Amino acid sequence: MPRVSAPLVLLPAWLLMVACSPHSLRIAAILDDPMECSRGERLSITLAKNRINRAPERLGKAKVEVDIFELLRDSEYETAETMCQILPKGVVAVLGPSSSPASSSIISNICGEKEVPHFKVAPEEFVRFQLQRFTTLNLHPSNTDISVAVAGILNFFNCTTACLICAKAECLLNLEKLLRQFLISKDTLSVRMLDDTRDPTPLLKEIRDDKTATIIIHANASMSHTILLKAAELGMVSAYYTYIFTNLEFSLQRMDSLVDDRVNILGFSIFNQSHAFFQEFSQSLNQSWQENCDHVPFTGPALSSALLFDAVYAVVTAVQELNRSQEIGVKPLSCGSAQIWQHGTSLMNYLRMVELEGLTGHIEFNSKGQRSNYALKILQFTRNGFRQIGQWHVAEGLSMDSRLYASNISDSLFNTTLVVTTILENPYLMLKGNHQDMEGNDRYEGFCVDMLKELAEILRFNYKIRLVGDGVYGVPEANGTWTGMVGELIARKADLAVAGLTITAEREKVIDFSKPFMTLGISILYRVHMGRRPGYFSSLDPFSPGVWLFMLLAYLAVSCVLFLVARLTPYEWYSPHPCAQGRCNLLVNQYSLGNSLWFPVGGFMQQGSTIAPRALSTRCVSGVWWAFTLIIISSYTANLAAFLTVQRMEVPIESVDDLADQTAIEYGTIHGGSSMTFFQNSRYQTYQRMWNYMYSKQPSVFVKSTEEGIARVLNSNYAFLLESTMNEYYRQRNCNLTQIGGLLDTKGYGIGMPVGSVFRDEFDLAILQLQENNRLEILKRKWWEGGKCPKEEDHRAKGLGMENIGGIFVVLICGLIVAIFMAMLEFLWTLRHSEASEVSVCQEMMTELRSIILCQDNIHPRRRRSGGLPPQPPVLEERRPRGTATLSNGKLCGAGEPDQLAQRLAQEAALVARGCTHIRVCPECRRFQGLRARPSPARSEESLEWDKTTNSSEPE
């Protein structure tokens, strides 16, 4: 059988074929609240009837008639009596009532016996135990669907803990789907039932003490509003509580009495405000209330009135479709007879196939007579009323608009005043010097005050700074409560906690934190002991005594090796007569013992020496020594600068292990702070030992504030364990304080909020924005820097030890060994190619070593063959005289005097040819050079000390 579909605006000519009465189609409506100033049900039925009868498409003169019967109380007897009055009138359907479950059950049974369709407009009661009649249809959404929708919302918000307030015991059966989900997910759902006094105050106090932030209320609209008003009196209507109402009429209640418009209230609605008749329908009801009532009871049409309006249209649509297939007739029935309406079953089949768009959305029924294929709108309370943030569809499930929800949170911060709890702590929050003349937030200054101003500018909120009552950050007590700022957040006495509040796992369990705005760690603060005053020999401090000793040994070793190598290598022995190469029997070595000791000194002082090494071995010794001195002098200069610019200070401990391994220096931290919790919960052996010491030490080593800890450090032998940021701040302002070692851990400061705060994401984004813009770093430099002590990485300069520069000593030793080896190779090579073949290698080696050990003179004769004569100098080839020549006296002989020039050249050439040792002819420029010789008193005639006098460059 095809589905019956018809719009409410168009009704074809169905009124032509009504057998029993060609002039009317009668419907009965039972109202249990028929007053004009209540729901407006009577008016809604009248509006539906008049709109149908005024339809221009209606053919014929038949009209829809709706007989209204009043039910003054929910009584089975009165309900049965009313039905006995309705049946003789020959009605095609019975509508209502809207709020009498017992009466509705009696009506369904009677209509089922007589096969007369019955439309319910109230939520189901006792779903598990009541059998739905075939003739009964319910336009109201089922409680099962509502419970599934609530479960979807809880999943969307990741809610694992909630409380359900029930006005009746039947709510556990009605919300079975919701309870089943909590059982499956193992989340926590506490159920609280209103007692006979109907006072929700005790229940709300229990919920507040349990710190439950999500509250589900399953009650009628009036009771739901009462619960919310009581919650407002207890301070539970704020941004940290979420209320979900299952009643579909709750959004029609007035919220003028709610002071805090940041409260997160969610509800459902089924109204179709886009319907063509919805605005006219609402205006008609509102006008009726204004004319007949002292006040308007609802902000919009009641749900029951809209459902009755849609029920009239559903009946008319089904009768129209049925009348097209067969002629129907309605005859009077009686309670006393067993007679039934013969067309009732057919009409019910057509009613189950009805599809139309009504004031309450899409109208369609399933095989059980329950409404299907519809959507529940999810509404959220704002300062401008409720607005839709999503919907739940029977077939498609939950669909939330996250953008609308997030924008509502941002809008709720706009121009909202937040209570900020904090604590006086330099430099985070301080009182101004003239704070007595100020009031409010103007009395305070510091890093946190400036950060609050930046956040307020971004998020557009106002704030009120309030100092915490007990002056502590917050620690758990034995009874489970918390002190300090954490306790105020748990009690919802404050919206934010802005201070040096450390993010810890224990605090994260009871409050929410924003992203960290500052990263830090625990450090050790201790006072420094001034070292001795600089002495006359403080210039020796850059190197440790061991380094100075090794440098002296290195100098002696280089001098000895240089003396040895220079004696061994033949390339350091040279003729002192430049003009008598090959003929002079004497060779000279410039590296005497004195010169060998002086040459390293000149290199070390970077002044050089007139002695130039000739052999490769001696040059190797010189190179490694110069490299050694380069590193040594550079290191000394750098470390000496540190000693001259930084005053040396001494501390008896260098690390946390040194502190833990001694008992002479007391150490402690702030009582009730995160540092104390860190040591208390640490599993590291060193930190456990430190905690046992601090916990058992008497008198107590814990302090109440940072200022007290600083004073104790300066006035006694005490080390203070505190955050590195505070350590840095106080070291900038007191040069007698120093940090020992590095950080003991890594953590961060965050903004504390109550659990479930809707502002958490907004503050996270704002903090990230400040970090990206470098604003937080700028604020930190503003409040941390500017002290009288310069910032130093380590104010205790130390002399360099062998572990720092030992490598250059290794290089020096290796170079010396290589030089000795090369000198021996040079000695052997020259000896093998010498003219004296009768002398053995060992004999020559022993002779040289004996000369080195005895420090003999650095002159010895040239080695010659046995019996050989000194070589004769070659005869100079006569050359033609040049046009000009330079004489030994420096005079020039030009071309104008050729005879004189030729005569002079011939004389000097003859002298050179006879072996004269005081005249030399340069083969390149043909210049004569004179050499004067004087006999040495200590040597033979061949042992001469030559003094060269020349008026030109050095000889060859």
Swiss-Prot record:
Q: Where is the composition biased (Basic and acidic residues)?
A: 939-948
Span of the signal peptide: 1-20
Q: List, in alphabetical order, the Gene Ontology terms for molecular function in this entry.
A: glutamate-gated receptor activity; kainate selective glutamate receptor activity; ligand-gated monoatomic ion channel activity involved in regulation of presynaptic membrane potential; transmitter-gated monoatomic ion channel activity involved in regulation of postsynaptic membrane potential
A Pfam family of the record is Lig_chan
GO BP: any one term: modulation of chemical synaptic transmission
Q: Which family does it belong to?
A: Belongs to the glutamate-gated ion channel (TC 1.A.10.1) family. GRIK4 subfamily.
Q: What is this protein called?
A: Glutamate receptor ionotropic, kainate 4
Lineage of the species this protein comes from: Eukaryota, Metazoa, Chordata, Craniata, Vertebrata
Q: What gene is this protein translated from?
A: Grik4
